[in-house]
Amino acid sequence: MRVQKPKGTVDILPDQSSSWQKVEETARNFFNRANYREIRTPSFENYEIFSRSSGDSSEIVEKQMYDFNDKGGRHIALRPEGTAGVVRAYVEDKMYAPEVVKPFNVFYMESTFRYERPQAGRQREFHQIGVESFGSSNPLADVQTIMMGHDLLAELGVKNYQLHINTLGNEQVRKDYHDALVNYFTPVKDELSEDSQRRLRDNPLRILDSKDERDKKFLPDAPKIREFLDDDTKNNFESILKMLDQLGIDYVIDDDLVRGLDYYTGVIFEFMVEDKSLWESATTILGGGRYDHLVEEFNGPATPAVGFGIGEERLMLVLEKQNPALFESNSIDFFIANIGEGTAQKAIEITRSLRKQGFEADFDVNQKKLKAQFKKADRDHAKYVITLGEKELENGVLNIKRLSDGKTIDLSLEDINDMSKVMGELKD
């Protein structure tokens, strides 16, 4: 048997997971400060949840979704993105009920799955951090969502990101734009890729998202959606841009931005990072927008909504270069080195007491020689080593050594139970 992880998956080992934890803890604290609460949904759903939300003609449904029939004959899919499952939960668990405060604001951190070619920052199992806000059609909801994405990236230490923004208008705007795209692409249909020939029939907007060179040559002269905006949609978009200006959030109006999912309506946006050492062109690390009809699509009441998702793998690649402090090795506060008859029991008691007080503490369960224990303390990046031998146990006095400069102090065994008394002296 070949023991090997599946293609497109990675092991996040202990020396790497600490940086992931820091990013997720920063994001979790950020969302809580914004009055968003965590939601957790299943990693698999009924297939229709994703096919209806993403769109049958989307690349996700056509090529990337992991789906299968389970032992009960149910058509199941692993989630390819986070929004659909949250919307399903919103409807099924009746979060639209009047007694639930609106807007209903949630965030999530979860694994997602897409069958695509693995490359830098893109795996077949990847991690997504996202937010969703249900219940407000006010442009302030769009602005807050964009502002949160902008400020979270800044708080994480991303430096050279740029906001790209566009609007997909209302239903009439999208219908008029749909017809214009059909009229534009139909004369060159035979020159399009096979996928885009099908998209021309099902959803010509998807052609604008094509990466195929046969399609890309026609995109610069394709109609732009803002040519079809009515006054209401135009005013909505301009009010959002004005608020972003007042917040000092720079942006680029990107006519080619359409996002890869069919459920988007109104304003859509992406935060992009350009780093030639990672990717040939600017790459999206956060994307989102408004989706005002998806709750209805899932048989819920008409509910406006807006949100975004972050690809955590891509984010970590950027942060590794731009915020290396996140990737520094973790340290522990205390390592208890013990040697001699009868010291092991006291060592574990001291470790337990320190942990209860909120300190990070460890000891050597293998009872190696003292020199080896000090080496382990150094590898664990311990700040202090407490030495416990037969003499210390007999006298009830411990020696604490600060590894950064070798400073030592003595304290009684009783002091261990309230280290707040001695931490000031240890830090001097």
Curated annotation (Swiss-Prot):
Localization per Swiss-Prot or TrEMBL? Cytoplasm
According to the UniProt record, one GO cellular component term is: cytoplasm
Keyword set includes tRNA processing: no
Enzyme class, broadest EC rank:
ligase
Task: Describe its partners and assembly state.
Answer: Homodimer.
Against PANTHER family, the record matches this protein to: HISTIDINE--TRNA LIGASE, MITOCHONDRIAL-RELATED, HISTIDYL-TRNA SYNTHETASE
Name of the protein in question: Histidine--tRNA ligase
Gene name of the record: hisS
